[in-house]
Design a protein with these regions (language model features):
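Aromatic-lined carbohydrate-recognition surfaces of secreted/lumenal glycan-active proteins
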Residues: 107-115
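Glycine-rich, histidine-containing beta strand-loop boundary motifs that form or position
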Residues: 46, 110, 162
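Short beta-strand/loop segments at the ligand-binding rim of alpha/beta enzyme cores
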Residues: 8, 99-107
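Charged catalytic cores and adjacent phosphate/nucleic-acid-binding surfaces used
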Residues: 1-17, 21, 27-32, 51-55, ...
Length: 216
C-alpha cells in the first residue's frame, strides 16, 4: 500500500506489442496511448519474448520496464525487469526461480481469469506480487475478488495491468508505485509492496475492436 510521501509513478504493468503474435500495438501507439492516459511508464510483457521490450526501450525515452509473459505448464507468469527469455513449459515454481535467478520480479498474472492460461491454485507465496486487477480478465469482478483473496492469503503486493493487445486499452488498469521513475526503483518498490492497483474492465467495444483488427 501507499502510505509515504515519496515520488509516485503510474505504470501499466502488462502490455503486449507486435512482438506478441496476437497483439497489434506498435511503439508509436504504445507511447501515444500511455501518455494520453497519464502513465509514467509501461511494462512490455510479450509472450515468451523480450525482443520487443528491449528494442522499444532503446528507441524511446519513455519509461519501459522490460518483461515477458511466460507460458509455464501451470499457467502464465509475468516477469518484470528481465532481459532474457525465461524457458516456457516449466512448473510455476521453477519459472519463479528462473525469474529470480536473472534478477527479475515474478507476478502471478490474472490468476483466476477464464480462458487466459491462469495459474489458479498454482499461485503461491513464491511469487513477488499478484496481478489483482487485469483489465482484460473475464469475468472481471470474480477474477478480481479471487485474486485479492490470494494476495491476502500469501501477504503479497497487489498490482494491476491491462493485458493490452490493442492500443486504446492501454492504461485502463495501472499501478501507482512509490518510486523514482526508473526501472530498478519501480520494480524494487513493487517487490517491497510500495504500490497500489487501480483500474476497470476493458469495455466490450474495445475487446471486439481488438479481434476485428486481428482478423481483418
Amino acid at each position: 500500500m501507499l502510505n509515504e510521501k515519496k515520488m509516485r509513478v503510474k505504470v501499466d504493468l502488462h502490455v503486449h506489442t507486435v512482438y506478441s503474435p496476437d497483439s497489434s500495438i506498435t511503439l508509436e501507439q504504445l507511447v501515444f496511448w500511455a501518455k494520453k492516459r497519464g502513465l509514467t511508464g509501461v511494462a512490455i510483457t510479450d509472450h515468451d519474448s523480450v525482443e520487443g521490450a528491449l528494442k522499444f526501450a532503446r528507441e524511446t525515452d519513455f519509461l519501459i520496464i522490460p518483461g515477458t509473459e511466460v507460458n509455464s505448464r501451470d499457467g502464465h507468469v509475468v516477469a518484470l525487469n528481465v532481459r532474457e527469455v525465461i524457458p516456457k513449459g516449466l512448473s510455476a515454481e521453477e519459472t519463479v526461480e528462473r525469474i529470480h535467478v536473472v534478477g527479475g520480479v515474478a507476478v502471478a498474472c490474472h490468476p483466476f481469469a477464464l480462458f487466459k492460461g491462469s495459474l489458479g491454485r498454482h499461485a503461491s507465496s513464491k511469487f513477488d506480487a499478484v496481478e489483482t486487477i487485469n483489465a482484460s480478465a473475464s469475468p472481471f469482478k470474480r477474477s478480481l475478488r479471487k485474486a485479492e483473496a490470494i494476495a491476502a492469503r500469501f501477504k503479497l503486493p497487489r498490482v494491476a495491468g491491462t493485458d493490452a493487445h490493442y492500443a486504446p486499452a492501454i492504461g485502463l488498469a495501472y499501478t501507482v508505485v512509490a518510486a523514482e521513475p526508473n526501472v530498478d526503483a519501480v520494480v524494487k518498490a513493487i517487490a517491497n509492496g510500495r504500490c497500489q492497483p487501480f483500474g476497470e474492465s476493458v469495455p466490450l467495444r474495445l475487446k471486439l475492436a481488438k479481434y476485428f483488427h486481428y482478423f481483418k
